[in-house]
């Protein structure tokens, strides 16, 4: 899984049978994660000098892992990451923002709609404080938080 919310995803995976009533939604698998930086408009400076450098680093991390399918929720940078997975003989699926929902992570975009009303329960969480940039509201009004 490649996402800015890897800490929350890892902590939520152990609750998968409490998040979803149907175990087919989030079945058992070996969870491997790669952290992706948030948008440059809201994130603190990173260890990368450019987005290209960050994507190349993530591709290198992908190449070092033994996986069958990668789930990605990273915006536009998902396209070169999926292409890399395919060139490596793997499968890549870009879920975008809704990737966090698969792991029971709430977001403002879904709070008052059918997802929030029908699926949220006491095991759903918000992204961790460490995954919440100071300027998170600059991304679509903070819809992922």
Predicted regions mapped to residue ranges:
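Generic structural hydrophobic/aromatic packing signal, biased to beta-strands
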Residues: 1, 33-34, 58, 92, ...
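Intrinsic structural disorder
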Residues: 8, 59-63, 103-104, 143-145
